[in-house]
Each structure stands twice: as C-alpha cells, then as structure tokens.
C-alpha cells in the first residue's frame, strides 16, 4: 500500500492534494504539521473521501499520558497511529493495551 503524506497546515491545500488521490490505491498520512493546524477536520475529510488514515504523531511521554492521548484519539477514523519507542517498554505496553481495547470495541466499524 502506498502512503501519501499530507504535510500541509492549510485545509484548502491539503484537501486539494487529497482530491488528486485514489483511496483504492493509497492511504494518507497525517503528521504533526497537518494535525496541529487542521487535525480533526482533515482526518474526517479524508475519511469521507474513502481513505484509510495513518496518524503519524510519534506519541512519546509517560505511559499514562500516552494511554490517555490514544483514548482521546480513539473516536477518530484512523487505521494506524505511531508512538516513539524511546518512551520505553512501559509506555509501549500502555499504548498497546489501550489500542487493543479500542480495536476490539470497534471490530465492526470501518477500520
């Protein structure tokens, strides 16, 4: 699967790029540039166009903060999410536990 980065902080430019893509041939990556400026709006826009979303935030903090961050992102229509492994084993285990719970709860959703 080809992953296309949407590294725009302007919704119009980001949506124009998305409109040039085919959701059957690629998925889109929303990183910190886009997420910090137009995050939820561009994620929902891309999902509405049929794209799978890769949210590339490289979460890195204490285990409980990463866990709560993932819980906060759980309502978004994302397929993949990155964490930064230098956060350590406990952080990665907390992320995995909450992610697994989220995936099990949404097995029938469009993920």
Ranges and model annotations:
Residues 95-96:
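C-terminal helical cap(s) of enzyme catalytic domains, especially alpha/beta-barrels
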Residues 101-108:
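Conserved small/polar residues in nucleotide/adenosyl-binding loops
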């Amino acid at each position: 699967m080809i992953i296309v980065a949407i590294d725009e902080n302007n919704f119009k430019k980001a949506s124009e790029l998305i409109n040039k893509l085919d959701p059957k041939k690629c998925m889109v990556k929303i990183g910190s540039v886009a997420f910090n400026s137009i995050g939820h709006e561009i994620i929902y826009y891309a999902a509405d166009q049929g794209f799978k979303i890769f949210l590339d935030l490289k979460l890195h903090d204490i285990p409980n903060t990463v866990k709560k961050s993932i819980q906060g992102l759980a309502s978004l229509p994302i397929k993949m999410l990155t964490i930064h492994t230098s956060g350590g084993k406990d952080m990665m285990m907390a992320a995995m536990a909450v992610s697994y719970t989220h995936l099990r709860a949404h097995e029938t959703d469009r993920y």
